[in-house]
């Protein structure tokens, strides 16, 4: 089987669109084998309504024997009532141009005012101003919101690769 990786659009037939050069350009590619394996970028292709199904849930007890690891605390990132980043329709994102974590209230205030989800650039998550689950870009979460507002972000191609599906 042939492989077409990173598909961003899949019209009818065996022709596909995929990003190249870290999202700076797109290429039209065509599958040339009878069988194709296709991978998509996150949220690139919407799900038709009503195609979901239920799955059976089966409980079981795992025998872990002598545990060498002890879980002290488990926590999920708080989304503060906002849509999960990969599904968000409105996103307000910021970068190092905010000059410090003490200025992040501006981003939160704007996001709250318009009902958006917050995001950040990789440098912001790397230096610890924001949690890594808010990092959008080539090495973070790829998003496709209807509106993407970037504040203090330089626009590096790695960042743009994760937000180029924004409308």
Please tell me what each predicted stretch does:
Residues 1-167:
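N-terminal glycine-rich FAD/FM-binding segment characteristic of electron-transfer flavoproteins
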């Amino acid at each position: 089987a042939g492989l077409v990786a990173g598909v961003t659009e899949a019209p009818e037939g065996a022709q596909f669109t995929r990003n190249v050069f870290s999202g700076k350009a797109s290429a039209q590619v065509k599958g040339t084998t009878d069988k194709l394996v296709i991978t998509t970028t996150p949220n690139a292709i919407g799900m038709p309504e009503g195609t979901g199904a239920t799955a059976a849930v089966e409980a079981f007890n795992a025998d872990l024997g002598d545990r060498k690891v002890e879980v002290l605390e488990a926590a999920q990132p708080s989304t503060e009532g906002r849509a999960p980043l990969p599904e968000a329709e409105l996103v307000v994102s910021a970068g190092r141009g905010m000059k410090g974590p003490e200025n992040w209230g501006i981003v939160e205030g704007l996001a709250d005012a318009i009902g958006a989800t917050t995001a950040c650039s990789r440098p912001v998550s790397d230096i610890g101003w924001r949690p890594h689950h808010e990092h959008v870009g080539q090495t973070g979460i790829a998003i496709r919101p209807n509106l993407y507002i970037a504040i203090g972000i330089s626009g590096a191609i790695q960042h743009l690769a994760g937000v180029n599906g924004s409308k």
